[in-house]
Every structure is written in structure tokens, then in C-alpha cells.
Amino acid sequence: MSQALRIVFAGTPEFAAEHLKALLDTPHRIVAVYTQPDRPAGRGQKLMPSAVKSLALEHGLPVMQPQSLRNAEAQAELAALRADLMVVVAYGLILPQAVLDIPRLGCINSHASLLPRWRGAAPIQRAVEAGDAESGVTVMQMEAGLDTGPMLLKVSTPISAADTGGSLHDRLAALGPKAVVEAIAGLAAGTLHGEDQDDALATYAHKLNKDEARLDWSRPAVELERQVRAFTPWPVCHTSLADAPLKVLGASLGQGSGAPGTILEASRDGLLVACGEGALRLTRLQVPGGKPLAFADLYNSRREQFATGQVLGQ
């Protein structure tokens, strides 16, 4: 390594915390950690720190939690840190150009997709939902645009037919930190230079919301199967049966046809439901007041609730 850098880290969720852990194991000096303000969480809506804040406090690092970085006071506070580089991972605040210009080497970002595909807020889930063959992490030099900056380094991983949003997240959370450490070494040595993105190839990973997690049985089974995997563990796909909500946490493609949403078969292998094209076998469900269970367990105790001919989602 050519030199140890003064680094400001900015991030919020567990994905970002994994990157901070990796940086703490390098000779670089973390001079401050920026993270989102504490948010209410849980049934009691108690204010809870982010994963990044908790880790930073464990290591005695200064923590900054501004509501915005657009005002002159916050920017002056950042400039006073005399950082060589700012590393940004799932921070959640927009960085104006004035902030991007403060560190000597600028700001770099670890983004959970193979840019320019899946710029935006939910790249992991959108890649699974779309049936992409691979995903990865791109380390880029940040610009004022949304995930538009020059690409410094890419690492890829195949997306398997069993991958969920959660499993792909965890794999990328292991790949990303190594890529960031490698990119920082190249920047410090002056040997790493960015490659411009092809905007014509860009796609956008819009933020997830609970409303889109409702299963639309008129869609093809192959699309719904990917949606179930993509939205596990959040926001979790759901439907209804006899006016009661039903969460769907596991599914596989099945054989059969009928009016969309119709239960074609119930067995220990799963609940077979007709779709717009093909059929989907629901293998892991959660009923109101219960915990997630394999359908075989529900079938043993609630067989009468899943009678053939009933229609889901009405």
C-alpha cells in the first residue's frame, strides 16, 4: 500500500456496516462516520441506531448524523475533517456536488449491481425479480447523478435459481468490502482510473414498497416465482384466502391450469395455484398470528382451509 488515507465513511444499513468492518482492518484512518439519524423501530417505536452507527461507536469513531448535507454548516464540518477520500455505501442522503468536491480524491460508492444495470435504490431485489443471470458490486467514483459515475472496479456473482433477495444481499455484502479495499489501494497509488458508464444500457431499480408485494395471479407463474424470491425477506409477497391475509415466503413452478388464483391441489408438497400462465406451488406460508411454516406443516393442521377450487386474492 502506497499510503494510509484519511477516510470519511458514510453508510447506514448492515450492508454498509460490512464495508466499514473491512476498512477498520486496513491501515487507513477512519476520521468520521456519517449515518442516518436514529429511526423509530419495533413495536414500541423506540429510536434505534443504524447498524453503521452501532459499529462505529463500538470502535470509538466520531459519528455524524446530519439531516442533510446541503447546508453550508454541514459542509464546513465535513471539510474540517481534511479527508483524502469519502467512502459511501447505502447512506440514504443525496450528496450535492459541493460535498463530492471536498475530499482530495473525491467520493467513491459501492453499489450492489453491475452498473449501468440497476442504478437506484433496490438493485439486489430487482435483479432477482427480473431473472438476471448474474449480479455483483460496482465501485464507482461518485457524481451528482444517481449512480452515474465512472466505474473503478466490478466483481460479479451468478444468481442461482434458489437465490432470494436475502441470500444475494449477503453474498454481495461479502464481495463489496473486498472490492472497496482494492479500489482504495489503486486510488492511493494513482493506478486506478474510472471507465465511463454507457447510459444507453442503464436500467433503474426503483425503491421497493409493500403495495407491489401483493401477488397478481393473472401474471405468469415464472414471474411470480421470481417475485417471491426477490421479496424475501422484505417486503414479503402476500395474497389472501377467504379474506384472511396469507404471506408467501417460498414457491416453485408447478404443472396445471385454471382461472388465475384458483387452488388446483393441496398436498404435503405445497399449495398449487393457477396463474395467468402455468401454475405456482406455494411451499412456505405464514398465516395471521403464526410464524412462517413449510406448507406440509400447515397442511397437517389446517387441511380443510385449503380446499381445491377456492380462489386466492379475492
Swiss-Prot record:
GO cellular component: cytosol
Record-listed E.C. numbers: 2.1.2.9
SUPFAM superfamilies: FMT C-terminal domain-like (SSF50486), Formyltransferase (SSF53328)
Keyword entries, A-Z: Protein biosynthesis, Transferase
Binding residues for (6S)-5,6,7,8-tetrahydrofolate: 113-116
Molecular function via GO: methionyl-tRNA formyltransferase activity
EC category name: transferase
Reactions the enzyme catalyzes: L-methionyl-tRNA(fMet) + (6R)-10-formyltetrahydrofolate = N-formyl-L-methionyl-tRNA(fMet) + (6S)-5,6,7,8-tetrahydrofolate + H(+)
PROSITE patterns: GART
Entry function: Attaches a formyl group to the free amino group of methionyl-tRNA(fMet). The formyl group appears to play a dual role in the initiator identity of N-formylmethionyl-tRNA by promoting its recognition by IF2 and preventing the misappropriation of this tRNA by the elongation apparatus.
Family, as annotated: Belongs to the Fmt family.
Protein's UniProt name: Methionyl-tRNA formyltransferase
Species whose genome carries this gene: Pseudomonas aeruginosa (strain UCBPP-PA14)
